[in-house]
Amino acid sequence: MICLVLTIFANLFPAACTGAHERTFLAVKPDGVQRRLVGEIVRRFERKGFKLVALKLVQASEELLREHYAELRERPFYGRLVKYMASGPVVAMVWQGLDVVRTSRALIGATNPADAPPGTIRGDFCIEVGKNLIHGSDSVESARREIALWFRADELLCWEDSAGHWLYE
């Protein structure tokens, strides 16, 4: 119940979801699931110190994916992207932590794996841009929209992270 209240509060007052309470949406794409990289990806975010607040394995509908990627509708690869994302299971996740949107983008690496440095998820595990393993929100605003698309408020778990005092001042 308290988490539901906090989620409603965060939607009414977006500035409340900054700092250590900032959230981002990540999705391991079908190639990442098929290649059995979900655990490795989760491990990297946990080791960084972020808190997992939601996770589910889903077969995304084309309708959901068209809404998720609406801003790319005019791009030539849009149709292929939607079909690809609907071609297999996706692991949808919400992570929470200080500056999690920006930091998760750095952990993921450049959209084009050729531009992603070693040590990033795409730099270590991807070869081509069409199969780049993972989606990560590109802004706090996008994260809010994407989280609301993929998760109901009651699916976002509020829990006390015992390691928090070792991570934040």
Swiss-Prot record:
Annotated positions binding ADP: 29, 105, 111, 122, 129, 132
Active site: 135
Superkingdom of source: Eukaryota
Cofactor: Mg(2+)
Reaction equation(s) it catalyzes: a 2'-deoxyribonucleoside 5'-diphosphate + ATP = a 2'-deoxyribonucleoside 5'-triphosphate + ADP; a ribonucleoside 5'-diphosphate + ATP = a ribonucleoside 5'-triphosphate + ADP
Single GO molecular function: nucleoside diphosphate kinase activity
Keyword terms: ATP-binding, Cell projection, Cytoplasm, Cytoskeleton, Kinase, Magnesium, Membrane, Metal-binding, Mitochondrion, Mitochondrion outer membrane, Nucleotide metabolism, Nucleotide-binding, Transferase
Bilayer topology: Peripheral membrane protein
Enzyme Commission number, as recorded: 2.7.4.6
Enzyme class: transferase
Localization per Swiss-Prot or TrEMBL: Mitochondrion outer membrane; Cytoplasm; Cytoplasm, Cytoskeleton, Cilium basal body
GO CC terms: ciliary basal body; cytoplasm; cytosol; mitochondrial outer membrane; mitochondrion
Key word Nucleus present: no
CDD domains: NDPk_I (cd04413)
Example GO biological process: UTP biosynthetic process
Pfam families: NDK
ATP-binding found in the keyword field: yes
Family, similarity comment: Belongs to the NDK family.
The protein's role, per its UniProt record: Catalyzes the phosphorylation of ribonucleosides and deoxyribonucleoside diphosphates, other than ATP, into the corresponding triphosphates with ATP as the major phosphate donor. The ATP gamma phosphate is transferred to the nucleoside diphosphate beta phosphate via a ping-pong mechanism, using a phosphorylated active-site intermediate. Through the catalyzed exchange of gamma-phosphate between di- and triphosphonucleosides participates in regulation of intracellular nucleotide homeostasis. Inhibits granulocyte differentiation. May be required for ciliary function during renal development. Independently of its kinase activity, facilitates mitochondrial tethering prior to membrane fusion through its direct membrane-binding and hexamerization. Implicated in repair of both single- and double-stranded breaks in DNA through its association with the ribonucleotide reductase complex (RNR complex) via its interaction with the histone acetyltransferase KAT5, this interaction enables recruitment of NME3 at DNA damage sites where it plays a role in the repair of DNA, independently of its kinase activity.
Recorded disease: A substitution in the initiation codon of the NME3 gene substitution (p.Met1Val), resulting in lack of full protein expression has been found in a female infant with an early-onset fatal neurodegenerative disorder.
Domain description: The N-terminal hydrophobic region (1-17) is critical for mitochondrial outer membrane targeting and phosphatidic acid binding.
SUBUNIT field: Homohexamer. Interacts (via its N-terminal region) with KAT5; this interaction enables recruitment of NME3 at DNA damage sites where it plays a role in the repair of DNA. Found in association with several ciliary nephronophthisis proteins, including NEK8, CEP164, ANKS6.
NCBIfam families: PRK00668.1
Name of the protein in question: Nucleoside diphosphate kinase 3
